[in-house]
Amino acid sequence: MHPIALAGIITVANAAGIAHAVEYPIGKPQQRYGMEITAVYLQPLPMEPDGMMKKPQDADVHMEADIKALASNANGFPEDAWIPYLTVKYEITKQGSSEKISGVFMPMVANDGHHYGDNIKLMGPGKYKFKYSVLPPNANPGSHHFGRHTDRLTGVRPWFKPFDVEYEFTYAGIGKKGGY
């Protein structure tokens, strides 16, 4: 067989073998301060380093905040670029309950790109309200610093003020864990 043809067959075979977990959207993407914030969930996932979040067997979902720059971003990020060094807090309430689930998403990367996320244990199937609180890089004094040019020639606009986005979604389960 011709080497180029063989390479093409191997490439197609490898691409077909790539598994992608099914992401379920939560509401519609929202736009704030030159950013698009998209909420999704999927099956809970094993993560590295070990201990950074709940193990898949102890969680119901892996929730994500996909935050990328819009063309109007005034902080120097090109369109569709991931925005790093944010603090993204979440709060989840199930309809009919006053109990809240809350935490802070961690920055991470997967085969579909950078995002903030966490493995979360919900309160069973039902309707949920979900709130993200998005804080700029300078709002977390305990984190690493992320510099911002402020001079007239190379500077960018000041960081945005913290804001919330809210979503509602119905959780019916995700099927067999690990059954992508």
Where are these regions (language model features)?
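Solvent-exposed serine/threonine-rich low-complexity stretches and specific carbohydrate-binding patches
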Residues: 101-110
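Short tyrosine-centred short linear motifs in exposed loops/low-complexity segments
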Residues: 114, 122-128
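Sec/Tat signal peptide C-region and signal peptidase I cleavage site
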Residues: 14-21
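Aromatic sugar-binding surface patches on proteins
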Residues: 110-117
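Short, compositionally biased P/S/T/A/G/V-rich stretches that sit at domain boundaries
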Residues: 21-57
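Short coil-to-beta strand junction motifs in C2/discoidin
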Residues: 57-59, 77-88
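Short amphipathic, basic-aromatic surface patches that mediate peripheral association
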Residues: 62-81
